[in-house]
Amino acid sequence: MISSNLDWLRIVGLAIGLCSLAFTSCNYDVPITPSPTRNIEKRLLGDLISLDHKENMKVRPLDDNTYIVYYDGDLFRAYHSDVAGTPFATIQDLNSNDRKYAYVVWKLSDDGKHLSLRNVSDKVISKEIKDSGTVVALLTKNASKPELFGEEIEFKKEK
């Protein structure tokens, strides 16, 4: 019984860690692209909750090209940084002094009710890169490789 309880706690811990990973792992010094590659997508706006009901996210427009994301007490700025036909987003932590970036790929279900996020692995795209051009080149080169992405985190729309 103890073993199964420990396994359960590990699974819960992993799930919580993965939900936090997409936004709290802002490790990069530069954005994917220095500016948005397209306007915001209105279907992404709204209140979302993780499938385990432990993580909340609110996505609002800042302007025509940029989102403000409220994620469990923290604020982030996000915009589309599409590369190689892949819907990447550049996410900047607005709460920290260093204002670092996270890179994610996103997918919205056809009905607009489910959003999945996968962070870009810093094992493929090094945290040491200091220019957006190199980031774009590496994302283009590795876009079809599964090891580019971390675990998928899913949210559903509340309203």
Can you name each region flagged by the protein language model?
Residues 2-13:
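Bacterial N-terminal signal peptides that target proteins for export
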Residues 22-25:
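C-terminal motif of bacterial Sec signal peptides marking the signal peptidase cleavage site
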Residues 27-44, 51-159:
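Calycin-type beta-barrel ligand-binding domains and close structural analogs
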